[in-house]
Structures are given as C-alpha cells and as structure tokens.
C-alpha cells in the first residue's frame, strides 16, 4: 500500500498486535527504503498513474486501521466521505523532486464535490496545476461508468495552466485535439472548479466578474419558495388594469379583483430556458408589506 508507511507500526499499531493476515491486508510500503537513492536525491522526476477509485466507506469495512492512519497523515483525508484517489494525488505530489511532474487519470468529481475541497486547496495553494484534459461524459474505460479527466501537476508553482474539453473521444484519440484555453493559475482555488474552453470559456469568465453573486446575497439557501397552500396563494392572471388585477383562484374556482401590490410574477423551474424565461400568467399572492426598522 503506497499510502501507508512503516510509521503505521511505530505508532498505534505495533507488530505484536497484528497477525500475518492483518499485515498482508495493510501491506505498508517504505518509499525511503525501496527507492533510497531517488528519495535521497530529492524525489521522482515523474509520477504517472491511474489511482483506484474506492469510497472510504468501503475501506472502512475492509481495513478501518488504514482509514484512521490516512486521516492522521493526509490533509485530503480529513473530509468524511472522500474517495481514495484524492489521497493518491497528495501522496504523488509529495514524492516529486523540485522539478518533478505528476500525471494521473482520475474522476473529475472532486472538481465540485465537497470531499474534493482539501485537494483543490492543496493544488491551489501550491499553484501546481499544469493541465487538465476533461472528458466530460465520455467513457474512457470500456465497461465502466466513470467520468474522468487527465490531470497534470508540477511540483513548482505555475503562472498559467492549460484546460482542454473533449467532446469527441474518438477524434481526440486520433488527433489529440479539443477545445482548449490557457488560463491564469488564479482561476484555481479551493472553491468548486468550473473551467471552460473555447468561446464558452470567455463567456464563463465574463459572467464570473459580474457582481453581486448569489453567494454575496445569502450564505445558504435551504429551500425554495414554499407556500404550503399553492391552490390558495398561486393564482392565474386574467386581466390587468392600472389599479387592479383580475385573477382566477384554483382553490375557489372563481375570479376576483385584487390590488396589484399584493401580486407578484412567479417563475417555476420548468419556465426557464437557455438565455430566456417562458412568459406565463402565473402570479403569487403575497399579502405582506416589508418594513424596515
């Protein structure tokens, strides 16, 4: 196990308390001993791999001692429900020499998942990101539903990184091209990664500069609009005049005239289309007045 070193036995798990089966299952690996010349020279020039994709819950059932060790040893193992591949990235980085490079194929779920935040922070802080080749929904491995990317990291800090989006896997395999963009490394942070290439990348970056953002207005949104009585509060506009609106009430199956200040346009999820909203005559009754202190 390349993630677990001999210090596993020196701390909470002395050899005397583990039988042969336990030792074989945990299978510690001593990088300093097995690659002594390389490690004494500063580390590896290159680390290349396809780390395992295993949820920590599975490892907890199989080898809980290892899970506890990882939590104490690695920053990327601090989140509760992480996937083991994020720890392999941290370990791979630590094995590089000052000019070393890492290249992994791995799921891109950590770009947005909560458990990926420690790894995103680690990469952002060191400005390690060199290149991402994002396969989106394309299935690279036959017979396995995994959504992957190629990620390349440098041990030394970078000023820019390259992002490529692959929409046609067969074409990419033949000619190695896709939509590409060169981006400043300042785009990499511990928040969710939302990189985009080509014309879409320019638009996304422009939208990112627009303020205020929703996160600036509120910390969290736990639930959308809820009336608890839609048939009463959601009505249909029939006619509008300057000082009154004629509405139809589904609850009463009747029409009424109401003051415009009590009614507001209501948009539901199904009304939103790319770059536009479907016009509806749906209104919501809001019989309250907002007052300031």
Label the predicted regions.
Residues 1-133, 137, 150-177:
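SAM-dependent methyltransferase catalytic region
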